[in-house]
Amino acid sequence: MSHQQPLSSSVQPTDIYGGDEVSALVLDPGYCNTRAGYAGEEMPKQVLPSFYGHINGRDVFGDEYIVPKPGFEVRNYMNRDSVVEDWDAATRMWEHVLVKRLQPERSTPPSKKGINISDDGDVPMEDDGNNNEDATDALEKPLAENPLLMTEAPWNSPKAREKAIEISMETWGVPAFWLSKTPVLAAFAAGKATALVIDVGGANTSVTAIHDGMVLKRSIQRSPVGGVWLSSQICKMWDGSEPKVDVVPRFMVESKKPVEAGAPAEANLRKFNFDIHPSFRAYEEERVLTEFKESVVEVWRGPQRFTTPGNEDAVRTQPGRVFEMPDGSNQMWREQRFKVSEGMWDETAAYNSTDEEGRVTKAQTIPALIKAALEGVDVDLRPNILGNVVVTGSTSLLNGFNDRLNHELAQMYPGVKIKIHAAGLTTERRFGAWIGGSILASLGTFHQMWISRKEYDENGAGIVEKRCK
């Protein structure tokens, strides 16, 4: 397979191959969000939560439909390893975002426009009983004009890879398909064909070495220390606070009054005449935790660890940050906002957790992942790879993250020239893999790489293992 070269930073995709001429779609499914859009564009047009609602035997997609209702359950089609667990739900979710959201004019045949759309905005699990093949052809093969590039985790299984091309070719009728690993695409988005990609996402953190546009398989490292893990650390911190901090999700608050910092909330809570499903409550609590992460949590920049004597006392004298809960209660956070993220770097600093998911070992910390990844790389390649460290993923947007990473790398590899490439824009850091896919799929030189329908018909789903390395 020929190696895929990224664009230089001075060349835009549309300069090489007009974006409006390309009907290729790029789909980047993740544990927290699913991103989709057209190749050649700078950002995904659609970003939907990978969490979806399930009520009365039907699935509903889109954040606007995740609202409190009797029996309303929140599910995710992926597991915490960022691998698809429920293929039926994944297929429906992807089709919803690729057709209904991206190309609404093609999502329903003219004969049925406006007829079968429910007020829940859902995609029913069953068809509506119309067996007229001609009338439903547009629904059966909704992507017959769109080549599709899909992203995958570097540890994705061969079975899952074959399932992805099967759905794309058989169910959606795509004319061409490609499957690309997220670290390769994140490197391409940064203009690199060789890099060490550190992806700190919602469900996990991975470190992968890329050489000439190919994943070095022995380098692949991952750990559950990502955004969801950080949320569990915040919950531990709140539980141990004086006074204890209770998470009251926004949907439960009817009205509130301003109160002093540390004072009890004065809020009227909504009363529901049905039980709220625990999965819905957890999903809504995660929204509050995400706000706290984005506005309060910070990474200790170094050069020493946060636990080094004197550091915590020094932070206590600095201005803190106030966070207001949805119920109006608020509190000033100083040293705690650094301590809560320190377990990502130093396992001894993590809040103790009784559940296995919340625990962190030394091998799961970011420095240990980097060390293990580079040990899987030929010694001669290491300097070049360390000179191109690409940081991506939403959790890498924590204040101070890049400074700390720089200090850790400098301590681990003294004398080696280290350069970190981290997009300054929030959207570019969150959508690194999607942007790389958009660049790749819009290249005129990439057209020879696509797996065509003819190749698929001749070789079956196994072609994806041979072609998409």
From Swiss-Prot:
Return the similarity comment: Belongs to the actin family. ARP4 subfamily.
Q: Which UniProt keywords apply?
A: Activator, Chromatin regulator, DNA damage, DNA repair, Nucleus, Transcription, Transcription regulation
Q: Where is this region: Disordered?
A: 104-136
GO MF entry, a single one: chromatin binding
Question: What Gene Ontology biological process does one annotation of this record name?
Answer: regulation of transcription by RNA polymerase II
Subunit text: Component of the NuA4 histone acetyltransferase complex, of the INO80 chromatin remodeling complex, and of the SWR1 chromatin remodeling complex.
Q: According to its UniProt record, where is this protein located? A: Nucleus
Please tell me the species this chain comes from.
Neurospora crassa (strain ATCC 24698 / 74-OR23-1A / CBS 708.71 / DSM 1257 / FGSC 987)
- Where does it primarily localize? nucleus
Q: What is this protein called?
A: Actin-related protein 4
Gene3D superfamilies per the UniProt record, alphabetical: 3.30.420.40, Actin, Chain A, domain 4
Q: Does the keyword Cytoplasm apply?
A: no
Task: Look up the coiled coil feature and give its residue ranges.
Answer: none
Source organism superkingdom: Eukaryota
Q: Which CDD domains does the record associate with it? A: ASKHA_NBD_Arp4_ACTL6-like
